[in-house]
């Protein structure tokens, strides 16, 4: 069974824990209790493959930012979560993305942009803005509501598909690099 290490990142209060708990336990947590770091595991079937999701729910508060590099090193894929009612949380996404790329020392890292709290009537981040940023980053965009469960499975499952795609691409590049080149015989006189 394949294990996927998923990391949920974003500013404080965007609903990272609520999304994770909704996926794992099928219920909505409506009280806000800032997370330092929580880890969850769940066995699921995605596209016919049974896999184990190892999900790290991270601290959004700035005082825990020193811990970020460590979990970014171990994560295979990242949910970049913002709240649709918070323009600031949307602006912070770029910082998280750049930090992930720096820590992973890679231009392309499996990520999914997640606009959470879509059940709210007031949105300060328009759908088009989020889609445009996701397009610039070359990553999928999923709208979710931890409260109604809308898009929750889709967000996590899409991230697993992005990780698989990334592994396939790296495998193909590796095979191309390992092909023997035409060899010429040399004679030393």
Swiss-Prot record:
One of its GO terms (biological process) is ommatidial rotation. The keyword Membrane applies. It catalyses: GTP + H2O = GDP + phosphate + H(+). Residues 187-189 form a propeptide. Its EC number is 3.6.5.2. The modification Cysteine methyl ester is found at residue 186. GTP binds at residues 10-17, 57-61, 116-119. GO terms for cellular component: membrane; plasma membrane. GO terms for molecular function: G protein activity; GTP binding; protein serine/threonine kinase activator activity. Keywords: Cell membrane, GTP-binding, Hydrolase, Lipoprotein, Membrane, Methylation, Nucleotide-binding, Prenylation. A motif (Effector region) lies at residues 32-40. CDD domains: H_N_K_Ras_like. It is a lipid-anchor. It holds the Pfam family Ras. A lipid is attached at residue 186 (S-geranylgeranyl cysteine). Alternates between an inactive form bound to GDP and an active form bound to GTP. Activated by a guanine nucleotide-exchange factor (GEF) and inactivated by a GTPase-activating protein (GAP). Its main location: membrane. It is found in: Cell membrane. InterPro entries: P-loop_NTPase, Small_GTP-bd, Small_GTPase, Small_GTPase_Ras-type. Ras proteins bind GDP/GTP and possess intrinsic GTPase activity. Plays a role in eye development by regulating cell growth, survival of postmitotic ommatidial cells and differentiation of photoreceptor cells. During larval development, mediates Ptth/tor signaling leading to the production of ecdysone, a hormone required for the initiation of metamorphosis. Belongs to the small GTPase superfamily. Ras family. PANTHER family: RAS, DI-RAS, AND RHEB FAMILY MEMBERS OF SMALL GTPASE SUPERFAMILY. This is Ras-like protein 1.
